[in-house]
């Protein structure tokens, strides 16, 4: 073809080994120069294709005009097209292994046509001029084990919406608008991070972004790749970290996507018992194939290094770890040892986390893992998977079951609130109340609470207070901070009008107070992984459904004593055991921060197996926070 090839022998070797971590800078579509000619370099991996060409706006989608050249045995095709330019739509036209004609979007494309269109769009992903220098300079210093993490989980398409211009207008905010409104709200509330759902390009709104076709493309629903980078940049300049949902567990069968990419199983396993999720109707990646592993690991690095994202929340980890996940007998293939562990996925996680965290100090890899798989956050070299943090699904299930109970029955389920402390230090945990808990007839957080409307609000405040004082980082899905009544739907914005009502505003202010307290007091975060940082005062007062505990600061200053009542019964003379004979300052109760702290002096009266104690008038559903 005459032009200088960009995919070198070294590229071939590294890609074949699964260690070409910058592969996205070679594969895909890249505006560049050939001598004095401006144009676009295209490269795609299609190992079993008979031929590949590029079709697009620049050649009137003519399959004959721009054939690609196969560069070597690994199966990468490439070409340079002077007529192609930024903004043009394109696809790869493939004659498959069996002679079939296939049109595919670019697996490494950085922008996509707005759905229902399925083409890729040429862009210059490196054109953004970053202004988050201060954030990035200090990012390597971040230590998630000793730092506060209060994460606001957000679905960008439904957090807020514009009024629709017509029936086809979804009213989405642009990434830039989101940046400004989100930053202002998150800062005001006291969150430290946002976790964004559905950023990678996906064809179906109702999948919430969990069936991805464009792993390297921020979804065009909210603007361009440049707009997306602006949002990250702006959030960083406002001292807000950004975590993305990331889905390496499976991919959809859409014709333009990764499935049967060149007429054969390229990204997935060929055997449907290994390559299909029957429950989800999706394909499973072949984690043992170096080029596939490379595609995914480089994708994680793309978001973190190219887009400055601060961490990834890895979806559906359990589905990757178990070969029989969601499958009946005969629908799966055992590993070489005859059991159900996916050895290739285990090695993939170790490789992924070692590379991502090794190259990017101060970032986090978070596992959504719903089983008791050991050492999810253990070091890879010690046999762990190497994640930074793991969602604490066990705590969440027990906590929500308890909170949904009528207060009369809580005394018989007291252990649901205490059991999590028996394993709290087995992993590095995030306590989560995610989008999954407020959909599919599960009710919003407010409507999970028992009783009349007033009781629901009081219960929810007590619930959030307990969550804040339990060891672990925090995640709360959008809308639950102000008492969203309806379940979440991706089709409509949150019910912000509820904030015109005093009770919703009061709940929002209470959550805001909790979050600002969380970031102010190291006792609440600096010893999350140290058993010395937590002490039950009374974990056994099941009859009255009252819990009392202490969170300790590593400096031994500004420790916090927390008491909560999960019945509507007032306890005017509730005696609390304390560790020392000193003054305890009440700084917050169920109504929020006190204008002036109240002093309680410990007396030499035994209570809760402690030498000292004091009396406190604890209201029904009351919360009390003391510092000492």
Residue spans of the language-model regions?
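Soluble or luminal CAZymes and related metallo-dependent hydrolases
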Residues: 174-178, 227, 291-296, 341-348, ...
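Carbohydrate-interacting/catalytic domains
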Residues: 1-148, 176-186, 190, 454-457, ...
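Conserved alpha/beta catalytic core and glycan-binding cleft of carbohydrate-active enzymes
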Residues: 308-310, 328-490, 519-529, 533-576, ...
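Short glycine-biased active-site loop of nucleotidyltransferases that positions the nucleotide triphosphate
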Residues: 69, 204-209, 253-260, 377, ...
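Substrate-binding/active-site clefts of carbohydrate-active enzymes
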Residues: 113, 136-146, 155-341, 608-610
């Amino acid at each position: 073809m005459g032009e200088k090839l960009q995919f070198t022998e070294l590229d071939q070797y590294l890609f074949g080994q699964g260690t070409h971590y910058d592969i996205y800078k070679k594969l895909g579509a890249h505006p560049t120069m050939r001598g004095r000619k401006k144009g676009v370099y295209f490269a795609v991996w299609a190992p079993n294709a008979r031929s590949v060409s590029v079709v697009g706006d620049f050649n009137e989608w003519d399959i004959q005009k721009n054939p690609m050249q196969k560069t070597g045995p690994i199966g990468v095709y490439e070409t340079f097209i002077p007529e192609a330019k930024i903004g043009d739509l394109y696809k790869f036209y493939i004659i498959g292994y069996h002679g079939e004609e296939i049109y595919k979007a670019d697996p490494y494309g950085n922008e996509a046509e707005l759905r229902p269109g399925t083409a890729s769009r040429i862009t210059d992903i490196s054109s953004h001029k970053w202004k988050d220098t201060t954030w990035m300079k200090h990012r390597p210093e971040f230590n998630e084990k000793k730092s506060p993490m209060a994460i606001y989980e957000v679905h960008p398409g439904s957090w807020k919406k514009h009024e629709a211009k017509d029936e086809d207008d979804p009213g989405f905010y642009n990434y830039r608008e989101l940046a400004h409104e989100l930053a202002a709200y998150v800062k005001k509330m006291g969150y430290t991070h946002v976790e964004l759902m559905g950023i990678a390009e996906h064809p179906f709104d109702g999948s919430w972004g969990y069936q991805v076709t464009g792993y390297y493309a921020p979804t065009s629903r909210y603007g361009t790749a440049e707009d997306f980078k602006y949002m990250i940049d702006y959030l960083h300049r406002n001292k807000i970290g950004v975590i993305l949902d990331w889905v390496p567990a499976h991919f959809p069968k859409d014709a333009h996507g990764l499935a049967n990419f060149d007429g054969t199983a390229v990204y997935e396993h060929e055997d449907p018992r290994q390559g299909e999720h029957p429950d989800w109707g999706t394909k499973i990646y072949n984690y043992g194939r170096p080029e596939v592993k490379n595609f995914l690991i480089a994708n994680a690095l793309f978001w973190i290094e190219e887009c400055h994202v601060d961490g990834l929340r890895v979806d559906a980890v359990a589905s990757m770890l178990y070969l029989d996940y969601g499958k009946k007998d005969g629908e799966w293939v055992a590993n070489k040892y005859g059991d159900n562990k996916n050895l290739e996925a285990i090695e993939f996680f170790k490789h992924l986390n070692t590379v991502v965290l090794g190259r990017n100090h101060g970032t986090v890899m978070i596992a959504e893992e719903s089983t008791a798989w050991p050492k999810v956050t253990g070091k890879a070299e010690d046999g762990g998977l190497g994640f930074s943090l793991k969602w604490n699904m066990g705590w969440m299930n027990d906590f929500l079951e308890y909170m949904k109970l009528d207060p009369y029955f809580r005394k018989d389920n007291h252990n649901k609130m205490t059991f999590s402390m028996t394993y709290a230090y087995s992993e590095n945990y995030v306590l989560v109340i995610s989008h999954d808990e407020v959909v599919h007839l599960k009710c919003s957080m407010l409507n999970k609470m028992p009783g009349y409307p007033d009781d629901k609000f009081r219960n929810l405040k007590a619930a959030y207070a307990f969550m804040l004082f339990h060891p672990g980082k925090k995640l709360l899905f959008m809308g639950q901070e102000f008492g969203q009544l309806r379940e979440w739907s991706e089709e409509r914005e949150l019910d912000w009008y509820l904030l015109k009502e005093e009770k919703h505003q009061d709940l929002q202010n209470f959550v805001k107070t909790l979050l600002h307290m969380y970031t102010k007091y190291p006792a609440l975060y600096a010893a999350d992984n140290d058993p010395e940082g937590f002490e039950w005062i009374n974990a056994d007062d099941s009859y009255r459904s009252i819990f009392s505990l202490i969170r300790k600061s590593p400096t031994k200053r500004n420790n916090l004593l927390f008491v909560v009542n999960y019945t509507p019964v007032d306890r005017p003379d509730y005696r609390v055991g304390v560790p020392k004979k000193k003054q305890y300052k009440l700084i917050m109760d169920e109504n929020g921060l006190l204008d002036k702290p109240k002093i309680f002096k410990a007396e030499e009266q035994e209570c809760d197996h402690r030498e000292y104690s004091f009396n406190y008038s604890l209201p029904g559903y009351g919360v009390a926070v003391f510092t000492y």
